[in-house]
Amino acid sequence: MVRAVLFDFDGVLADSERLHYEALVHALKEMGLNLSWEEFKQGCIGVPEWDAVQWALKRNGVNDNELVAEVLRRKTQIYDSWLTERLKVADKMADVIRALAQNFVLAIASGSFRHQIEAVLLREGVLELFPVIVSCKDYEQGKPDPTPFLLAMERLNEFISPPLKPHECLVVEDSPAGIQAARKAGMLCVAVRSYYDDEALKDADFIVDDLKGLLMPKLWEHFQMTPLL
């Protein structure tokens, strides 16, 4: 029985991957470097911020951790300056979250920075519905390693009784790396269509068109989930 829903953030709750890409390219161009959208999809979605920047630099033939830190600092600065005005959330995001919170405990396990996640959730009025937020500073091994999701479950278990088990957690993801992480954690997984085709999402238990698909009766029947009140 599903008792908890663990969300990725970028591409699931927020339509933010394009903004991340634009900010990264802006920072790279200041260094005389570049990255295509297809390259970004290949190596930068669903992974921690440091790993994404490191991958982008290696793609440009650069292997320098000091430069990774500098590009990440600049990319974060640019992204944060755009956050309030340009970042859009998934359609009906707040409504979906409030509906799910009636029956399940919720958490976020993301490769983004905590302040970026909290700023958006606060803006949308749902921050208090996520007792646990795991961000890129909370772990060393990011997705596709299962650590982010297992850590989110562990932190939920600090105030849930009986403790959650992996098979009682439903992960909502949009990237192959995130789906792999959920699988390795022994958790169920729903994939939201965003920037990848269904072939790339095939290892998920269920695929939905958008976040609103989490409220479909067909999905609830598939996972034998408790009906909404």
Enumerate the predicted regions with their spans.
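An amphipathic alpha-helix signature
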Residues: Y21, V25, E49-Q54, R114
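Short, acidic loop-to-helix structural element flanking the phosphoryl-transfer center
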Residues: S81-I108, R114, E118
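A metal-dependent, Asp-based hydrolase signature
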Residues: I45-S81
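Asp-based, Mg2+/Mn2+-dependent phosphohydrolase catalytic module
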Residues: M1-R3, A94, R114, E118-L229
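Residue-level detector of anion-binding/catalytic polar loops
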Residues: N34, V105-L106, L188
